């Protein structure tokens, strides 16, 4: 290993000069930027470009839903599936009581689902959208308007995510194009309300990268009040802060998260416990469902897997433990984004259900963990296959004797495509952790651009001799070093 040298240049990393796929794709707009091109000085900088691209892709996703918006949500048993434009949003407007001005969590809903089965902040988001929806006209018109209002609010969330991802790695703003141009982002953004929690999570990660540990915790607490998965990031930071000895920063994050979560949840918990707890009881009692590895096993074996809850919880804990062990034994402390991606991916892969919009949880994390277009597009291809597979399978099982759509064997192939491509991207990230010279983010000498207080910090606790190996020579100033390695994938 050659001696480390300091990096003084703050010039943004240009993916077209490092990534063959990005360079080839740039030919559509004039080719890669030249070595001596002048950067900066123009109001349309990388962050604004990324945000505009994300808004444009979101709008394309809305166009893709146009057949459903005009008629397929409201006519026929399978039209919304054969056109692959299904969304929960218009359907839940009526069946969850928003059309009747029922108050989420407080008012009982007629039908099988007695209370809204979403966390509190997501319920508030849904309620605000219902306030902005015109109360006159036919039910079809009101459902269309409710979807449109939600789409506008979710577009704002998408722009926030794009900006936060672009700003998290200071020298790599263009990596956020992985999020903005992701096919699965455009296809799934308006299926459900997941972008709210993702926006809060992305904002939290930006704050952590800037050393704002308590504000990070507040945003993660609010994100957890909108969706459960963001709390996993606290587990990631527990291990990383353990290795780096940054307990004060971790404590501030935990206190901020707990306080924000309680502020968001406590009023509803106290005043409407049964309605508030519905999300948690529903998640616990829910049987295996579409897209999960457990459904694939059940269909192939004929075993209903009544204990899938136990299996899913046990496997998730096992994988999280393995990821924690990886973090404490790796030759170099893993980057925050790498472990965050692995833990959330483990949660998704082990879950009892995989809704197609869950891919949105991973896209920003993937852009930060492994900003390499080839690997990203391989994964996205598997997710697009699953996106089409679930809708065509639902068309098949709802079309009666017509058998219109994808039979169960084809749907199982779609599930396998999702599982295998996600595992592939996880394997590449693990490879980067074990062999840091393959990590494209660290190629310029950076340590952990999203790590905040962890960036450049010395290790104080490790579990392996490889992790105890001293670094060549700590730089006297700055946190970025150059290992002297050539380009690698």
Please give the residue ranges for each predicted region.
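Multi-pass membrane glycosyltransferase architecture that uses lipid-linked
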Residues: 2-276, 313-489
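Periplasmic/ER-lumenal interhelical loops and adjacent helix-loop junctions
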Residues: 270-314, 324
């Amino acid at each position: 290993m050659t001696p480390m040298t300091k990096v003084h240049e703050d010039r943004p990393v240009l993916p077209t000069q490092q990534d063959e796929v990005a360079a080839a794709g740039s030919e559509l707009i004039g080719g890669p930027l030249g070595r001596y091109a002048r950067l900066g000085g123009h109001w349309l900088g990388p962050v604004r470009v990324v945000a505009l691209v994300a808004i444009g892709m979101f709008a394309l996703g809305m166009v893709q839903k146009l057949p459903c918006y005009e008629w397929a949500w409201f006519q026929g048993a399978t039209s919304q599936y054969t056109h692959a434009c299904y969304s929960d949003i218009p359907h839940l407007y009526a069946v969850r009581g928003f059309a009747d001005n029922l108050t989420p969590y407080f008012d009982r809903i007629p039908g099988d689902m007695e209370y809204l089965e979403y966390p509190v902040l997501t319920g508030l988001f849904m309620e605000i959208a219902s306030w902005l929806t015109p109360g006159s006209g036919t039910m079809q018109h009101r459902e269309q308007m409710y979807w449109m209002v939600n789409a506008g609010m979710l577009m704002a969330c998408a722009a926030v995510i794009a900006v936060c991802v672009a700003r998290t790695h200071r020298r790599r703003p263009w990596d956020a194009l992985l999020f903005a141009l992701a096919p699965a982002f455009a296809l799934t953004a308006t299926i459900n309300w997941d972008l709210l929690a993702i926006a809060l999570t992305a904002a939290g990660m930006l704050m952590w990268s800037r050393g704002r540990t308590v504000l990070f915790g507040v945003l993660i607490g609010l994100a957890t009040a909108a969706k459960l998965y963001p709390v996993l990031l606290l587990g990631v930071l527990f291990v990383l802060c353990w290795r780096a000895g940054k307990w004060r920063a971790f404590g501030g994050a935990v206190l901020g998260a707990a306080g924000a979560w309680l502020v968001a949840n406590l009023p509803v918990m106290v005043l409407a416990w049964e309605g508030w707890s519905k999300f948690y009881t529903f998640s616990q009692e829910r049987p295996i469902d579409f897209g999960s590895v457990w459904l694939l096993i059940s269909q192939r074996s004929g075993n209903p897997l009544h204990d899938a809850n136990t299996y899913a919880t046990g496997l998730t804990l096992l994988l999280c433990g393995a990821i924690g062990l990886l973090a404490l034994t790796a030759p170099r402390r893993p980057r925050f984004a790498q472990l965050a991606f692995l833990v959330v991916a483990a949660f998704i892969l082990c879950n009892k259900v995989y809704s197609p919009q869950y891919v949105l949880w991973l896209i920003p994390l993937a852009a930060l963990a492994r900003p390499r277009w080839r690997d990203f597009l391989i994964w996205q291809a598997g997710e697009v296959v699953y996106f089409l597979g679930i809708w065509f399978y639902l068309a098949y099982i709802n079309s009666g004797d017509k058998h219109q759509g994808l039979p169960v064997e084809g749907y199982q192939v779609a599930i396998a495509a999702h599982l295998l491509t996600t595992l592939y991207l996880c394997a590449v990230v693990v490879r980067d952790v074990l062999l840091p010279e393959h990590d494209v983010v660290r190629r310029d000498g950076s340590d952990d651009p999203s790590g905040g207080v962890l960036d450049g910090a010395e290790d104080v606790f490790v579990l392996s001799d490889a992790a105890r190996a001293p670094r060549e020579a700590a730089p006297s100033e700055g946190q970025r070093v150059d290992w002297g390695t050539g380009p690698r994938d």
